[in-house]
Curated annotation (Swiss-Prot):
PANTHER family in UniProt: BAHD ACYLTRANSFERASE, F21J9.9
Name of the protein this chain belongs to: Limonoid 21-O-acetyltransferse
Catalytic activity: isomeliandiol + acetyl-CoA = 21-O-acetyl-isomeliandiol + CoA
Residue stretches in coiled coil: none
Subunit structure: Monomer.
UniProt note on tissues of expression: Expressed in maturing fruits and in juice vesicles.
Keywords linked to the UniProt accession: Acyltransferase, Transferase
Gene from which the chain derives: L21AT
Pfam families reported for this sequence: Transferase
Active-site annotation: H152, D365
Family note: Belongs to the plant acyltransferase family.
Pathway: Secondary metabolite biosynthesis; terpenoid biosynthesis
EC numbers, comma separated: 2.1.1.-
Cross-referenced InterPro entries: CAT-like_dom_sf
Amino acid sequence: MDLQITCTEIIKPSSPTPQHQSTYKLSIIDQLTPNVYFSIILLYSNAGESTAKTSDHLKKSLSNTLTHYYPLAGQLKYDQLIVDCNDQGVPFIEAHVANDMRQLLKIPNIDVLEQLLPFKPHEGFDSDRSNLTLQVNYFGCGGMAIGLCFRHKVIDATTAAFFVKNWGVIARGAGEIKDLIIDHASLFPARDLSCLAKSVDEEFLKPESETKRFVFDGPTIASFQETFTSFERRPTRFEVVSAVILGALITATRESDDESNVPERLDTIISVNLRQRMNPPFPEHCMGNIISGGLVYWPLEKKVDYGCLAKEIHESIKKVDDQFARKFYGDAEFLNLPRLAGAEDVKKREFWVTSWCKTPLYEADFGWGNPKWAGNSMRLNQITVFFDSSDGEGVEAWVGLPRKDMARFEKDSGILAYTSPNPSIF
C-alpha cells in the first residue's frame, strides 16, 4: 500500500469538562476486561467534498462529540482505577493513500487493513496511550477509510458503535446526544483482584495465532434456521452461526496432533450486553463496559450437534439477567469461578464468542452516506467476533486460533457448507 501520513493533530473536547465530572471511576467489569485495544474500520466509497473541507468537518464534529464522551479524551490511571478526564484529547491522524480503494480492499487482508489504523491494536498496551486514537485515510479515487482504536478497559463495542453513530449525528446536525454517562461503578464497584490466580490479559497476549474472516450470507442462515425442527422457536441468527463455529472448533480440537494434550472439554464464554437486561434498563447507548458472559460447557467426547449447541447457547444467554449481574459483579461471585481462582481440575480449552451485530456501525453517516463496509483488523486468539454484513442479513465471523487449529477449522464440513471464506466486500 502506498500510504503517507500527512498530518497529526490532537483534538480536544469543544467545551471543558466540568470539575464535578473530572473523575470517571472504573467498575469491576472494567477491571476484568482485558487491557487491550480493539479497532473499527469504516469504508466510504465517496467522501464528498474536498479533503480539506472533509477534514475540517470531521475535526470540528469530533471535538463536539468528545464533549459528550469526555472519558475518551482523558487519561487512564489504572493504579487508581479511574480515568482522569483532563481533556488531553485524542490523536487525529490523516493519511493519503495513492491506491484505488476498491482494488486494494476488494478482499480484506489483515496486513493491509492494519495500515489504515493509527497503530496495531495488539501492540498498544502502553498506559500513556490515549483511550481513543483515529486515522482518516483519503484515497486517490475519492474513497475514505476511518480507522479507530479504542481502549477496551474504558469502553465496550456497543459504546464504540454508538460513538461513531453519534459522531455522525453531530456532524450532520441531526439531533441531540444525552444520557451517555451513567454511574455503573456504584452498582458494580471496583475491587482488589490481587487474589486472582490468572491474569485477565494472559490469554489475549499469545502471538502464535491466525485470524480469518468467514461470511455467512443471509439466505444461507435463513435456510439453515429452518432445519432446527426440534426447536420450540426459531433459533436466532447468532445462535445458529455460533453453533457452526463451535462445532468446527470442537472437531478441530479433537484432531490435535498432540493426543496427550487434547482437552476434555470446550468452555465457551459468550459476551452478553447487560444494558437492556438490567432492571431498570440502562440506556442502550450509555458508555462503559456493561457486559457479562454466558458459559457453555461441551465435553469433547460428546458428538457435535448443531441443535444441542444452539440450545445450550440460548440457555446460557438467558441466565444473564439483572439478578445474575448484581450477584456476579456486585456481590463478587465471580471470585468463585475456578478458572480465575486457579482451582480447575479439568483439562479444558477456553474460547470466546462476542457479537457486534445489531450495533449501529452502519449508521455512521457524516454527511456522505452510510459506510460501504464496517469491520476490524484485530489479530485474535481463541475468540470469534461477529459483525453484520453490509446488507444487514448476513454475519461476518472473524475467527482467531492457533495456526495448526485454524488449518483444521477452515476445512470443517460445517464451515465449508455454510460460509464463504473472505469474499469481496465490493
